[in-house]
C-alpha cells in the first residue's frame, strides 16, 4: 500500500450528515502529522437524458442556490446518501424525482468520483438516467423550493463547461461521462 498509517482519529463536530474529525497519521519515514477530515456518507448524481425525434440528446439540469458560495449553481440532480443502507441507484432515482420531477426508466452506473480527496472521504456515484417521464414531486427545503429545472441539449451543456457556466465537479464529471457513454453507444 502507501506506507502511510492512521494512528488516531477523534470527532471534533458531529453534524446532521457530516462529521468533522481530526486525525493523526504516520508517514513511511516515521514522521507524524495531523489532518482535519470531513467524514461523509457520500452522494449520488444523476444525468437524466432525453432524446428528441432526431435522436439528439438533451440533459436535465437544476439551477439552485448554494449557501457556501452564496450563489446559484447549475448542477445535475444529486443528493446525499443520507438513508442508511439505501442503494446508490435508488438514491439516484429518488433525487431525480425530488429535484427534477422525473422518474427514470433505466439508470446506468457511469462511475465514481472523489470530489475533494484532500479534505473529505466522500465518494460521489454518477448515474445516467434514460426513459424519463414526468411525475408529481415534493421539493425538500428552501433551496429546492426555488430550484429551476433546465432542459439543455447535451452539446450546449458541454459548451457551458467550456465557458464556465457549469463548474460543479460532479456535474462536469457526469456530463463528460455521459457524452463518452453516448458516443460509445453510437460508435462515434
Task: Mark where each language-model region is.
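Conserved Nudix-box catalytic region and its N-terminal flanking loop in Nudix hydrolases
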Residues: 38, 55-94, 136, 143
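Acidic, metal-coordinating catalytic segment for phosphate/diphosphate chemistry
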Residues: 9-47
